[in-house]
Amino acid sequence: MRKLTYLLCMPLLFLGQTGRSQGCIAIRNLAGFGQFAQLGYAQTKDKWMMDVDNRYFAAHTVLFGRTNETPADLSSGVSLHEWTTNFEITRLLPNDWSITLDVPVSSNETLGKLEHAQLYYHVTHAFGLGDIRFSVNKWLLTKVSNRGNIQVGLGIKFPTGNYHSEDYFYEDPNNPAAATLAPVNVAVQLGDGGTGFTTQINGFYILSSAVNLFGNFFYLISPRDQNGVQAWVPGSIPPSFFALQQQTTADVNSVPDNYTMRGGANFTFDKLVATTALRYEGVPAHDLFGQNDGERKAGHIFSAEPGLQYKFKKSLLYAFVTIPVDRETIQTVPDQRATKITGTYMITGGHFANTLFFVGYSFTF
């Protein structure tokens, strides 16, 4: 009998960084996550798996808590656009072990007048390599007769992405050509500047030849507190408010944890597979380890995620779209400090995706 190998394709973004953002709220690229395994067991003599995953989102919805404060004239605010291609290669090892290297490349931009003193409509941009992640994974059940399995993985995220990307900002009312070089919005930075540690759990259960269930959990632990990059951009906040930011540590970007949970079902129709899933993801206000200083866009997103996959002999083509159900920003530690100082409830706003979809191709060799 040929050795039975559980195949797991894990398109991980990051998007830019391993914990990237849906606008200002972190999101992981889990669309298509675990699809080979979720479609059942696969017999293979191949030793490698490759996944090329592409993500695009556009965001202009601005929430403070659950209150929508998106400007009627979108050009007066900030819109976010991100394109990320993730290259992930997995080496299959004996006894259901595997190792994975995840390399993201991103092109991110903000558009609008808000970052340019409400005077000029401009684009700020960041392009390049994101934060690379390496992980070791193990399937826990080895019996061929099992209708399901659970995989656990531990990894490390390296600060390879530029977390100090800069572009030009225009805020001189007397000279439209005058520009200030400064760090771009944290939502479009390519990395977070911290070495992180990841834990993940993936599982599936085969109900029948046509239906199987799956679940995924991912958590990025970021021990570093702040990365030293200024959190504000020229022209985006009043000078008086910046003094409050300094007092509460919100003037410098944080290096936050982030998490994703996802579960759903696959329905197989010969080579075509329809997937329906729910996903919950976000950035906590308090990290598991370390301090919680600095500017972070804390909050969570609950979404529905339908998708289609097409199976070939040794490969898989997939496309997913996320549909937001509930979105909320929450108070950060600097927000709580500002509330205490001013006596007024303070909360950091966050952008949320209005368009978000994933397209990818996975294969073994």
Tell me the role of every PLM-derived stretch.
Residues L63-A72, L220, D225-F365:
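Outer membrane beta-barrel transmembrane domains
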Residues Q38-Y41, V52-N54, F87-R91, L101, ...:
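Residues on the lipid-exposed face of transmembrane beta-strands in outer-membrane beta-barrel proteins
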Residues G77-E82, T124-G130, Q189-G196, N253-D257, ...:
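Short sequence motifs at beta-strands and strand-loop junctions characteristic
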Residues G19-F64, E69-P71, L141-Q151, P159-H164, ...:
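Outer-membrane beta-barrel biogenesis signature
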Residues L111-V252:
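Outer-membrane pore/translocation modules
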Residues W48, T61, W97-I99, K143-S145, ...:
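Repeated loop/turn-to-beta-strand initiation elements of outer-membrane beta-barrel proteins
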Residues L4, G77-W139:
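Long, hydrophobic/aromatic-enriched structural stretches that serve as scaffold segments
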Residues M1-C24:
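Bacterial Sec-dependent N-terminal signal peptides
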